[in-house]
Amino acid sequence: MCSIGEDDFGDEGATHAMVAESLPTGIVISPGDCNKCGVVSSELYKLNFRVAECRDCFLNHARHKFRASLGAAKVLPRNAEVLLAVDGSAESLVLLDMLHFAQTQNTFRRLHCNARVVYIDDQSVHGGESMNLQALQALGTRYEPLEFYVVELGASACSLQRLGQYSTSLKEPNGLNTKLEKLRSLTARQDYHQQQRKNLLASVAQKLSCSHVFEPSVSGDLAAQLLTSITLGRGGSAALDVALLDDRLAAGVKLLRPLRDLNEQEVRFYVHACQLKPLRESGSSYGQERGQTASLQNLTAAFVGNLQQNYPATVSTVFRTGDKIAANAHMEQASCAQCQSPLDAKLSDTLLANEYSRAVSEAGVGLSKDGDASESLAKQRLEFKDGLCHACRCIQLELGYDTLS
């Protein structure tokens, strides 16, 4: 009989009953024998649930995950045009290094695709230090012959420039900052920031005639994204937010996440093994400097980060749940004009209740006494063909007369 009663499930749920991982993991600097190939190595890598191994065996393991994610599902056609999104994070540099390595192998093991790299400069929106152009140019030199491009977040794809021709002083004015300032909550600003970045990637890919975009999201990022999508009212498209293949981008561009099977520990080890130098620190994305409780996204990321630290096996279970909750799609189903997610065809009771509360609050005492009138107004709002999903409509209400795009 279970000894955990209902009173045992407090604010922390049942996490107190779970046993945290106690395996000694990390980079062992002292020499030792690799348990995979038997070679004496000056540096051993010990991952969770794996034996200590040398640098070459670890790199083979990590790179195999990258190749296997693309090969098993056969989502990348031969000689496809690929755009790699680099933001300077450790994850994006790992993906860049893996892609470059896969393209410089012999003919038999080579990844047959034509890759380009784009760096989205978001420092004007982020409010931090200006982008390290010198470090970015060093990346371009290290990973030749890949072509590097730079574009500013909030600008049009027409402002795309090659890295060698880009100047931080010659930036086009854009209204993204103004729109972000109009949004009251950091949750809405981060959601809108993410959608704008994704739409810009689609525009850049279309301009460069790329059919696929590589995004450097790992398992922890996807677990946080799945939970965030559900809390923001994007549950109908949450499966696509964490899937290997996301086909919602404009102009038929497909978004791929080939690092979804890697975890934070493997990324950290890979950075050390290949001596990569990230251009930005972990946890420095837009809005994260405001603290863990400043937004739903920050709170969810902190929760998943705690899971990753204490119960690493749980994180992959969370994001893989997204593969099982995909909604039934219809060919004739309309999509959101902002995030391209499928629109709900049926009137949701939950959304109706939210709109009912909003209608009563905005109308005041007079209309709140007439329940039928309030319900009718709520239905009119939901049935209004604005081409937006629930989450994007909430952002539009905060922006007022400004358009999302």
UniProtKB/Swiss-Prot annotation:
GO terms for molecular function: nucleotidyltransferase activity; sulfurtransferase activity; tRNA binding. This is Cytoplasmic tRNA 2-thiolation protein 2. Keywords: Cytoplasm, tRNA processing. InterPro entries: CTU2 (IPR019407), Rossmann-like_a/b/a_fold (IPR014729). Its main location: cytoplasm. Pathway: tRNA modification; 5-methoxycarbonylmethyl-2-thiouridine-tRNA biosynthesis. The keyword Kinase does not apply. Belongs to the CTU2/NCS2 family. The keyword Cytoplasm applies. GO terms for cellular component: cytosol. It is found in: Cytoplasm. Transmembrane segments: none annotated. Plays a central role in 2-thiolation of mcm(5)S(2)U at tRNA wobble positions of tRNA(Lys), tRNA(Glu) and tRNA(Gln). May act by forming a heterodimer with NCS6/CTU1 that ligates sulfur from thiocarboxylated URM1 onto the uridine of tRNAs at wobble position. GO terms for biological process: protein urmylation; tRNA thio-modification; tRNA wobble position uridine thiolation; tRNA wobble uridine modification.
